[in-house]
Every structure is written in structure tokens, then in C-alpha cells.
Amino acid sequence: RGRFAYGFTDAMTWTNKNGKRMRLWMPEETEIGDPQDFMDQLVDNIVKVVTEPIDIHVNPTYLPAEIADQYDALWTDERIDRMVKALAENGVALEINNRFRIPSATIIKKAREAGVKFTFGTNNGGADDLGRMDYAIEMIDACGLTPQDMWYPEG
């Protein structure tokens, strides 16, 4: 009987405190309300997700289009630290996503300092995504990532 080499998931589909099931990449299904409250709920959800038996948190730090232009302001040090701590404590790697150009260099640097490992991904949203690693390469340079910072499947 075979096994998967690794497991990954994201926090882009969840039910908010009002009971609304959301897919964050679909504006018609997303309910933001107060952006600060939304972010607190999102980080709570990310922390829950990375306690599951997964290896990689993908599409990390993704924000819906409605608030994406507030990324740096909404991803506060406190929120970053909560997420990074959960990743480190659970041994979950963080994807550097070329399609969405996330997470930010600030987040990557904090995660690296905490011992979090990294992977690269594209989200395979279309032909333009495949084989593109421009953002990952940019972050390798900007954050001083080395092969030792990368996540590798066991076995």
C-alpha cells in the first residue's frame, strides 16, 4: 500500500464567525467586514490548519482582493509571529508562492529565524504559472535563503 510523500493545505477556505463559508479567492464568496477582525479570524484559522498532520502550508498569507492592497499593514508583527510560531512548533514548511508573490520578505525572514523550512510553488492557476519561479528566486536573494532552509520530503 503506497503513501504520499508529503501533505499540504492552505487556509483559503473556511467558515467565518458569522457562519459564512468562504473561498478567499472568490470575491462573491468573501465577507471581510472589519479588516482587523477578518485578519484575526484568518490567523486563528491558519494556526488551526498548521496543527493538522501536514508538511507544507501553501498559499500562505493570501488576502482577498478587497484588502490585498493593505497586506503590509494587516500582516502585523503580532500576526506574523503567531503564524510563524505555529509553523515552527508543528514542523510545517512555508510555501513561497510565485503566482501570488507571497509571503513577503519580512515574513520569510521571521520564519527563517524561527527555523521554518521553505518550498516553492506556483498554484498552477494557468499556463503562465507553470515553470515560473521569479518571485522565489527574488526571495532567495532578498532573504539569504540557502539549501539548508529548504524543506525536503523524508525517506
Regions found by a protein language model. Name each.
Residues Y71-G155:
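Charged catalytic cores and adjacent phosphate/nucleic-acid-binding surfaces used
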Residues R1-E89, D141:
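Extended substrate/RNA-proximal surfaces in nucleic-acid metabolism proteins
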